[in-house]
């Protein structure tokens, strides 16, 4: 671990105290895990503490840990992962919070801390079904209005449930159950004895 990362790690441990569930280093970055109950308070501390000053939320996304590590994962299924940047101190940290309930994954919204979280949280809600409590306008942002399910969940079928097509008779777009025709996906290989000037 570099001196800069060691300094950041010490500052995080001092400022957050027992709110740190785990703090690990990998590939030159620190990953901080906090409990859902401490998430909002920890994020506010990360922004406001003078020794940290993470002024900017760079990214926020959802993660589905179902079947993670070939089924070796036995923790909570859903997490929200944020990447924060301190312009003042020129360092970054990744913050992970797991939703305690797999059936209805809920974590606090950080839109009151960083307004840039707005569309990131909407995207995580749309694609993973993560509910961000306190979000001012939590609705779908990428999928269609009548879309059912959350397409980035690992239990969502790759083909989806319905397909959309234009119906010339009704003169509008219609939805219908997915129709997939079986097809040969193995390429046909033709071997020639003298291909490329090589002799066999």
UniProtKB/Swiss-Prot annotation:
Q: Which GO terms describe its molecular function?
A: NADH dehydrogenase (ubiquinone) activity; NADH:ubiquinone reductase (non-electrogenic) activity; quinone binding
Annotated GO CC locations: plasma membrane
Q: Which SUPFAM superfamilies match?
A: Nqo5-like
Record carries keyword Cell inner membrane = yes
Cite the entry's keywords alphabetically.
Cell inner membrane, Cell membrane, Membrane, NAD, Quinone, Translocase, Transport, Ubiquinone
Q: Which reaction does it catalyse?
A: a quinone + NADH + 5 H(+)(in) = a quinol + NAD(+) + 4 H(+)(out)
Residue ranges that the Swiss-Prot or TrEMBL entry lists as coiled coil: none
Q: Where in the cell is it found?
A: Cell inner membrane
Membrane topology (UniProt):
Peripheral membrane protein
Q: What is its EC number?
A: 7.1.1.-
Entry annotated with the keyword Cell membrane: yes
Primary residence: membrane
Identify the Pfam families for this entry: Complex1_30kDa
Q: How does it assemble?
A: NDH-1 is composed of 14 different subunits. Subunits NuoB, C, D, E, F, and G constitute the peripheral sector of the complex.
The family this protein is said to belong to:
Belongs to the complex I 30 kDa subunit family.
State what this protein does.
Answer: NDH-1 shuttles electrons from NADH, via FMN and iron-sulfur (Fe-S) centers, to quinones in the respiratory chain. The immediate electron acceptor for the enzyme in this species is believed to be ubiquinone. Couples the redox reaction to proton translocation (for every two electrons transferred, four hydrogen ions are translocated across the cytoplasmic membrane), and thus conserves the redox energy in a proton gradient.
- According to UniProt, the name of this protein is NADH-quinone oxidoreductase subunit C
Question: What gene name does this entry carry?
Answer: nuoC
């Amino acid at each position: 671990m570099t001196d800069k990362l060691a300094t950041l790690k010490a500052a995080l441990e001092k400022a957050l105290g027992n709110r740190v569930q785990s703090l690990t280093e990998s590939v030159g970055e620190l990953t901080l895990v906090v409990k859902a109950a401490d998430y909002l308070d920890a994020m506010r501390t990360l922004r406001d503490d003078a020794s940290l000053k993470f002024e900017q939320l760079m990214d926020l996304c959802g993660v589905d840990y179902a079947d993670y590590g070939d089924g070796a994962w036995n923790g909570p299924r859903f997490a929200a992962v944020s990447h924060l940047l301190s312009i003042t101190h020129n360092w970054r940290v990744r913050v992970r919070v797991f939703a305690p309930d797999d059936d209805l994954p809920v974590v606090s919204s950080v839109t009151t801390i960083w307004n840039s979280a707005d569309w990131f949280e909407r995207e995580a809600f749309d694609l993973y079904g993560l509910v961000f409590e306190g979000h001012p306008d939590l609705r779908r942002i990428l999928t269609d209005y009548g879309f059912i399910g959350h397409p980035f969940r690992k239990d969502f079928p790759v083909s989806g449930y319905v397909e959309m097509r234009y119906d010339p008779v009704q003169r509008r777009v219609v939805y219908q159950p997915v129709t997939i025709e079986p097809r040969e996906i193995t390429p046909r290989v033709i071997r020639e004895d003298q291909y490329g000037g090589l002799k066999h």
